[in-house]
Amino acid sequence: MHSFKLLLALIVAICTSCDAVPRGSLSDESNFKSYPVAQYEAANHRLLRAKDGKVRADEERLSSNPDSMLTRIKSFVNPGPFHELVRTATAIAERLKETVHSTLDHWLTIQRFNHLLGHCDHDSMDSAIVRGFHPSEFRVWLDLKSPLATEVVDSLDEWPKSTQLQSLLKFIKHYHSLLLPPPNHWAKVRASINPSHASSKPLFHDVYGIKEALEEMDHIIDQDLSVATMLEQKVSPLLYKVALEARELKTGKRIDRSKLNRFIKGYMAQYPSLDKFESMVNGYAPPGKFRKIPTFKGLDDDVINPPKYLNP
């Protein structure tokens, strides 16, 4: 009887330890270092475990459709166990207090981060913008790229003191200036890319490697989605604008801009202005501390000046 009690106690102890660290979790030391965003798992472990059941259900639901985006993505991207990556991405979204994306969007966003890490640096923001990155996503990318990323989780107050905040504010200003550029800006950019094809080559086509993204925007244009639907699906207004101009170049016909204008206006209304964003991430800094933003190499000065609504 005594031996039976000892055996039972041993089984309970083993089960308890297994429950504390799920098998295959990023909290397992053997797996921890193999993930670029593993540090977020440790900081959000309890939160993630509570969400684990929902994430696994989402995985099964999404995987059941052979034509789904998930199935197509998994055919050429295999970074690790799907549910672990989703849980980590969900933790990042929670940390940023971003609740507008679905679980699948979080996972796809991580794939975009991983792809961009090898193609861009802090000062080369054009490719990040034209690929459809939003400023909140760019901040996560900066966190991942930073050598201080392991310290960010333990001391969030240290983050605004680094050069990352300046990079992020540069990105936001550049992002908004490209959404509402000066007249004839895109024509000048096209001419600078390839003067001999200035009137026929679609903007950024094959230059930044986003042919697939523009083709996806083409489908959205063909479907004639409403502004509300595009906002709900988090369509990038910049890519939508570029796709419209690419179609105009292809067909030679002018496309009505009224929907694009409503789309941009609705999109901007969902996100804070630059001033509000500064207050949010850098509340203790003196006003205007980060407002002197350097010009971008290779771009005209008039492109860098932000729209008036950013400087009320």
From Swiss-Prot:
A motif (RxLR-dEER) lies at residues 46-61. Residues 1-20 form the signal peptide. Keywords: Host nucleus, Secreted, Signal, Virulence. GO terms for cellular component: extracellular region; host cell nucleus. It comes from the Eukaryota. It is found in: Secreted; Host nucleus. Its main location: secreted. Belongs to the RxLR effector family. Secreted effector that completely suppresses the host cell death induced by cell death-inducing proteins. The RxLR-dEER motif acts to carry the protein into the host cell cytoplasm through binding to cell surface phosphatidylinositol-3-phosphate. This is Secreted RxLR effector protein 14. The lineage of its organism: Eukaryota, Sar, Stramenopiles, Oomycota, Peronosporales.
